[in-house]
Swiss-Prot record:
Family in the record: Belongs to the HOATZ family.
Protein known as: Cilia- and flagella-associated protein HOATZ
GO cellular component entries: cilium; cytoplasm
Pfam family membership, one: HOATZ-like
Additional comment: Named Hoatz according to the Hydrocephalus and Oligo-Astheno-Terato-Zoospermia phenotype of Hoatz knockout mice.
Role according to the record: Required for motile ciliogenesis and flagellar genesis by mediating the maturation of the glycolytic enzyme ENO4.
Tissue specificity remark: Specifically expressed in tissues with motile cilia and flagella, such as brain ependyma, lung, testis, and oviduct but not in whole brain, liver,kidney, spleen, and eyeball.
Top-level taxon: Eukaryota
Organism: Mus musculus
Main localization, broad class: cytoplasm
Start and end residues of each stretch annotated as Disordered: 142-168
GO biological process: axoneme assembly; cilium assembly; flagellated sperm motility; spermatogenesis
Length: 168
């Protein structure tokens, strides 16, 4: 079933009356399915969720605050600004915390690498033991026998051989 963005089944008289042909194509489905799909597409509408709709009223808090006098704003900014030493302390504390976190991650990855190496070493050891056991038991294993089905020819094969001998 091929569908377009909107529309209805094309190639039908009903669809040509309601919508332009070619917007929605239903191939390989029954007439009833096509009609139900057409009703769905004509009735479906995509409204935004209620959370995403903005409601603007006169007393709305969504509006921006009114600008104040620039002199008052400058005095407020100068009195509220922290000392530059506080910013440096914050940067130092942040850098230390970041270094500690990086060292913990590095230790975690080194531990994972060590575990991986141990697992690979164990697998190599088990493989070598398995190969050595197979080599020890190799002389005592029965050898593969040729299947009898290859040695015995079918009746048609025997007839063919007899006919060839008769021709000679």
């Amino acid at each position: 079933m091929e569908t377009g963005p909107r529309g209805c089944p094309s190639g039908r008289k009903e669809s040509q009356e309601i919508c332009s042909p070619g917007l929605l194509v239903f191939t390989g489905c029954s007439e009833q399915d096509a009609n139900l799909a057409k009703q769905f597409w004509l009735g479906a509408s995509m409204y935004p969720t209620t959370e995403s709709q903005l409601v603007l009223t006169r007393g709305s808090s969504q509006r921006l605050p009114v600008a104040r006098n620039s002199k008052v704003v400058l005095r407020e900014k100068s009195s509220v600004q922290p000392f530059p030493f506080d910013q440096d302390k914050d940067a130092i504390i942040f850098a230390k915390a970041q270094r500690i976190q990086e060292s913990e991650e590095r230790a975690k990855y080194l531990q994972k690498a060590k575990t991986r190496d141990e697992i690979l070493q164990l697998l190599r050891k088990q493989r070598e033991e398995r190969i050595s056991k197979e080599l020890i038991s190799l002389p005592y294993k029965p050898k593969d026998k040729v299947p009898k089905s290859k040695e015995v020819l079918s009746e048609s094969g025997l007839r063919d051989q007899e006919e060839v001998k008769a021709l000679e």
